[in-house]
Curated annotation (Swiss-Prot):
GO terms for molecular function: DNA-binding transcription activator activity, RNA polymerase II-specific; RNA polymerase II cis-regulatory region sequence-specific DNA binding. It is found in: Nucleus, PML body. Residues 301-310 have a biased composition (Acidic residues). This is ETS-related transcription factor Elf-4. It comes from Mus musculus (Mouse). Transcriptional activator that binds to DNA sequences containing the consensus 5'-WGGA-3'. Transactivates promoters of the hematopoietic growth factor genes CSF2, IL3, IL8, and of LYZ. Acts synergistically with RUNX1 to transactivate the IL3 promoter. Transactivates the PRF1 promoter in natural killer (NK) cells and in CD8+ T cells. Plays a role in the development and function of NK and NK T-cells and in innate immunity. Controls the proliferation and homing of CD8+ T-cells via the Kruppel-like factors KLF4 and KLF2. Controls cell senescence in a p53-dependent manner. The modification Phosphoserine is found at residues 187, 633, 640. The gene is Elf4. Residues 169-182 have a biased composition (Basic residues). Residues 86-205 are annotated as: RUNX1-binding. One of its GO terms (biological process) is negative regulation of tumor necrosis factor production. Residues 141-168, 338-351 have a biased composition (Basic and acidic residues). Residues 208-290 bind DNA. Keywords: Activator, DNA-binding, Nucleus, Phosphoprotein, Transcription, Transcription regulation. One of its GO terms (cellular component) is PML body.
Length: 655
């Protein structure tokens, strides 16, 4: 066999030893196995030299890219014509031939696409000419050896590369698909660090397990003895005292109003398999925690036991007066706040205080600007303590004393100070022998241009023995004020010809007569929010204040709400009206107008003026504005005695 190297074609010539004429080579019938193949580009031949076998191949060029005929061109009888030329190129030629015929990829992707043209069709390869080289063909044995060595190298390198790529791809796929999940503990009770409340799956709100909810109920003082309780805390055994209530609470927690014990019981049975809870056999609604959690709040049953009746009775009697009486009294007083003063607090309710008689007691009051609110009032009242204390008799006191009551018109943010002097008057059937001077009740008010005071009188004629209680009580509900005065107003028995008492007004020209034991009950209202001076501790103010003095039998006073007084007076329809006097003030000056008779009220009341009667019939209406004057009645109407203790309704718990 002879191989000729030409610049454009690679020609393999197969001839027999008996051929001498070169022209016979043109006859195809004589040499049917001579084949000429063409390479697409000359530079591609250098790529097939076997130096690039370590690079990754792709599937662009297959067996059909460099086509060969179906007839085999290599046979055992083929001989090389020129051994001297072919010995130097044995290895390179065999590599080129086997690289062309190998079924694997032979070209690198980068080198293929870096060429100016890409092979588009396998059929077009047949029309491309290859450069002609004269190569020496080795023997078939040598070809087999070299081909085996080349194949082993290629396969080993390709397997290594494919394995590395597969490992990388599998590692990336595992990282993308798998997500780390926290191992859930078999028994959450054993993990004290685990929080009770956890975020839900959607990230909204929080969720809580049923066993955690039961633990929370067992540690709550509001539910532990009442709905659920420990039977054996050391063993973790508890009982559902009220299973319906517990299930309702659990339904409220889970936002399921129709939750019942049957549904909750299925959830409890789920914890049997998890090893968290266990059912105590033979006992209904009794469960047990398999493992008790740590840091539990221990609630003793003794702390939750209700108070004994003796303790409750002592607590009720220790308050002066009782809370029930305070609530009843305060419920009768209604105050309305204007829209402008909604931010300001309403009547502040003072707490019950147990102190001795003080020279002065102050109470902070807040009133609206444009609304008329009654500040204080005085009336006959029975003691708010027990009846046993009222029957104590005390000997006569060495000397009477005066009661000074100062009332200032109340504006927004102003204060009312009640000045009192300790009173040691003894109430008996008659004036005590040692009494050297009559008791005086002084009503003092700070003048204001738009302040009006309605005054009416009450007659005390029922004999009552009381012991002066050395305490001061400020009860809840404004303007209910019990300030340093005894609880009862009482006087001597009605005399046939009572000695007239004098009522003196500041700057007045003449006195007016009243039977002994009368009390001036004053309603003071304000209709403007102008600032006014405040009555403070110390002696009485100057004479510019309005003062009403009642002299006569020993009297004592008590401040109660106006609404309470009206309700009590409605119940006393059988009482006769008493002669009344009106002390009205509209400015700093007073003038006395006499010989004016007041018409009796439309229905029986106790000494109410027409203004008070008008307010009583129409509720809290506008006040009757009058000129500054003092009006008195020339004659006195007969009066009938009545029991002042009937004005306050006593209940069994108050006794």
């Amino acid at each position: 066999m002879a191989i000729a190297l030409q610049p454009s074609d690679l020609v393999f010539e197969f001839a027999s030893n008996g051929m001498d004429d070169i022209h016979q080579l043109e006859d195809p019938s004589v040499f049917p196995a001579v084949i000429v193949e063409q390479v697409p580009y000359p530079e591609l031949v250098h790529l097939c030299s076997g130096l690039d076998l370590d690079e990754v191949h792709n599937g662009i060029i297959r067996d059909r890219t460099l086509c060969m005929t179906q007839d085999q061109i290599l046979e055992g009888s083929i001989l090389l014509t020129d051994d001297d030329v072919s010995t130097s190129n044995n290895v390179s030629s065999t590599e080129v031939l086997f690289n062309v015929a190998t079924p694997s990829d032979v070209l690198d992707e980068k080198q293929i696409f870096s060429s100016p043209e890409v092979l588009s069709d396998s059929n077009s390869v047949q029309a491309i000419n290859l450069p002609n080289f004269l190569l020496s063909t080795p023997e078939p044995d040598d070809l087999k050896k070299t081909s085996d060595a080349g194949d082993q190298k290629e396969h080993s390198e390709e397997e290594k590369v494919s394995r590395e790529e597969n490992l990388r791809k599998m590692g990336k796929a595992r990282k993308r698909n798998r997500k780390t999940k926290n191992n859930r503990s078999t028994s959450p009770v054993t993990d004290p660090s685990m929080p009770i409340r956890k975020k839900s799956k959607d990230g909204k709100g929080s969720t809580i397990y049923l066993w955690e909810f039961l633990l929370a109920l067992l540690q709550d003082r509001n539910t532990c003895p009442k709905y659920i309780k420990w039977t054996q805390r050391e063993k973790g055994i508890f009982k559902l005292v009220d299973s319906k209530a517990v299930s309702k609470l659990w339904g409220k927690q889970k936002n399921k109003p129709d939750m019942n014990y049957e549904t909750m019981g299925r959830a409890l049975r789920y914890y049997y398999q998890r090893g968290i809870l266990a059912k105590v056999e033979g006992q209904r609604l009794v469960y047990q925690f398999k493992e008790m959690p740590k840091d539990l709040v221990v609630i003793d049953d003794e702390e939750e036991s209700p108070e004994t009746p003796e303790d409750s009775s002592q607590a009720s009697t220790s308050s002066t007066p009782s809370t029930s009486t305070i609530r009843r009294a305060s419920s009768r007083v209604g105050t309305r706040a204007s829209p402008e003063d909604k931010d300001n607090p309403p009547w502040e309710k003072p707490k019950v205080q147990h102190t001795g008689l003080q020279p002065s007691a102050s109470l902070e009051l807040g009133l609206s600007v444009d609304e008329e609110v009654p500040t204080t009032s005085t009336m006959l009242a029975s003691p708010l303590q027990s009846q046993a204390r009222l029957t104590k008799t005390v000997s006569s006191s060495p000397a009477p004393s005066n009661i000074h009551l100062g009332v200032a018109p109340v504006g927004p943010g102003s204060t009312v100070t009640l000045q009192t002097i300790p009173l040691t008057t003894v109430l008996t059937n008659g004036p005590p022998a040692s009494t050297t001077a009559p008791t005086q009740l002084v009503l003092q008010s700070v003048p204001q241009v738009s302040t009006f005071k309605d005054t009416f009188t009450l007659q005390t004629s029922f004999p009552l023995n009381t012991n002066l209680q050395e305490n001061q009580v400020a009860t809840q509900g404004a303007p209910l004020i019990l300030s340093g005065l005894p609880q009862l107003l009482a006087g001597a028995n009605p005399q046939s010809n009572p000695a007239p008492s004098q009522v003196i007004g500041a700057g007045s020209a003449g006195p007016s007569s009243q039977p002994p034991g009368t009390v001036i009950a004053a309603f003071i209202r304000t209709s403007s929010g102008t600032s006014v001076p405040v009555v403070k501790e110390g002696p009485l103010r100057s004479s510019s204040y309005v003062q009403g003095v009642v002299t006569g039998a020993p009297v004592e006073g008590l401040l109660v709400p106006e609404e309470t007084l009206r309700e009590l007076l409605r119940d006393q329809g059988h009482l006769q009206p008493l002669p009344s006097q009106v002390l009205s003030r509209g400015s700093h000056n007073l003038s006395l107008v006499g010989n004016q008779t007041l018409s009796p009220p439309s229905h029986p009341t106790v000494g109410l003026t027409p203004v008070a009667e008008l307010e009583l019939s129409s509720g809290s209406g506008p006040l009757f504005v009058t000129e500054p004057s003092v009006t008195r009645s020339p004659t006195q109407a007969p009066f009938s005695p009545f029991n002042p203790t009937s004005l306050i309704k006593m209940e069994p718990q108050d006794i």
